Amino acid sequence: MADKEAAFDDAVEERVINEEYKIWKKNTPFLYDLVMTHALEWPSLTAQWLPDVTRPDGKDFSIHRLVLGTHTSDEQNHLVIASVQLPNDDAQFDASHYDSEKGEFGGFGSVSGKIEIEIKINHEGEVNRARYMPQNPCIIATKTPSSDVLVFDYTKHPSKPDPSGECNPDLRLRGHQKEGYGLSWNPNLSGNLLSASDDHTICLWDISAVPKEGKVVDAKTIFTGHTAVVEDVSWHLLHESLFGSVADDQKLMIWDTRSNNTSKPSHSVDAHTAEVNCLSFNPYSEFILATGSADKTVALWDLRNLKLKLHSFESHKDEIFQVQWSPHNETILASSGTDRRLNVWDLSKIGEEQSPEDAEDGPPELLFIHGGHTAKISDFSWNPNEPWVICSVSEDNIMQVWQMAENIYNDEDTEGGVDPEGQSS
């Protein structure tokens, strides 16, 4: 009986998801300046824009690249580099180019040829997360289903993978007992990599001091303050010795690598009422950071007074797995997770007056809801070169590259707009 009910619930949910998607698709021309939808061969659990951009002469597009991975059933997995053509601001297109069948537009009726897989490198098991090293973006670290963290220099691998399926990382980083997701390169100290794991620990490696012969590098330091799965870890963006970590013990911890006590953080705070899955430091304000949780909220923190949560962003209907500040705007951050939504928030709007109708759509600081995914969003990344462009990937193989309509973030058009979920008001 319970099975029947579960099947019925699933069918109802699927119908709701499909209906919502239809409404979203119908409204994309009003909500977006760009939407590209691409079905990957396998779902990617990870997405990160590389920092470089090519602007070919005489063309109305620029070429950007992404680091992706695969999560296959039983087939060979790969670390993937893809290229994406984004239209220039002056590219000629209008709403008549909109392809209502696919819910895509932006001068590209369809995306064929606009998103291409450039490099595939054999990987051991799915790629839980992949992140490039800021000082040398050819170097990419990956989290595997085993306890090892792998490092690849993608310039040293053929663009087509060896059919044998053999995985040949340039380095293999040891120190964990279990898999995990959190991964962070120090933006101020080249080669310093942090990793978070299900084994309750955080490992630090320095790959700049690696002997040329050995492929295996042992952790320089192991931090053991958390009492449960460590979900995410992130270096502070300005202070080379500070980093933060979050875990299933519901805590946010701030660490200083100069301290000799690797089992006690400088600060520890009960951040949420459920597991804490992600964190992000603000690139413009050295004291501000955000955390996302299974309690469905994003919390805002000030390092100068962690006892007091600055704000709680509430609108998600399920667990939050990723939070990222915009690289271009001090007050903008985005969050995503199990509810298939990516929410963009604007701190500067906290506490603004709202009409009762607007309040029904969400708090004033909820700037936009990206409703284009029909499955859990695994990861997303703000494009560092094109403001407001985001790439998001979901569990059903879909990758979307999109940019909300300018009138949404440029506030002039506030009358009779479209509510963030895409139902016209």
UniProtKB/Swiss-Prot annotation:
Binds directly to histone H4, probably via helix 1 of the histone fold, a region that is not accessible when histone H4 is in chromatin. Forms a large corepressor complex that contains ncor1, sin3a and possibly sin3b, histone deacetylases hdac2, hdac1, rbbp4 and possibly rbbp7. It is found in: Nucleus; Chromosome, Telomere. Gene3D superfamilies: YVTN repeat-like/Quinoprotein amine dehydrogenase. InterPro entries: G-protein_beta_WD-40_rep, Histone-bd_RBBP4-like_N, WD40/YVTN_repeat-like_dom_sf, WD40_repeat_CS, WD40_repeat_dom_sf, WD40_rpt, WD_repeat_RBAP46/RBAP48/MSI1. The keyword Acetylation applies. It comes from the Eukaryota. GO terms for biological process: DNA repair; DNA replication; DNA replication-dependent chromatin assembly. Core histone-binding subunit that may target chromatin assembly factors, chromatin remodeling factors and histone deacetylases to their histone substrates in a manner that is regulated by nucleosomal DNA. Component of several complexes which regulate chromatin metabolism. WD repeats lie at residues 32-125, 126-175, 176-223, 225-270, 271-314, 315-371, 372-404. Belongs to the WD repeat RBAP46/RBAP48/MSI1 family. The gene is rbbp4. One of its GO terms (cellular component) is nucleus. Its main location: nucleus. Signal peptide: none annotated. It comes from Xenopus tropicalis (Western clawed frog). This is Histone-binding protein RBBP4. The modification N-acetylalanine is found at A2. Keywords: Acetylation, Cell cycle, Chaperone, Chromatin regulator, Chromosome, DNA damage, DNA repair, DNA replication, Nucleus, Repeat, Repressor, Telomere, Transcription, Transcription regulation, WD repeat.
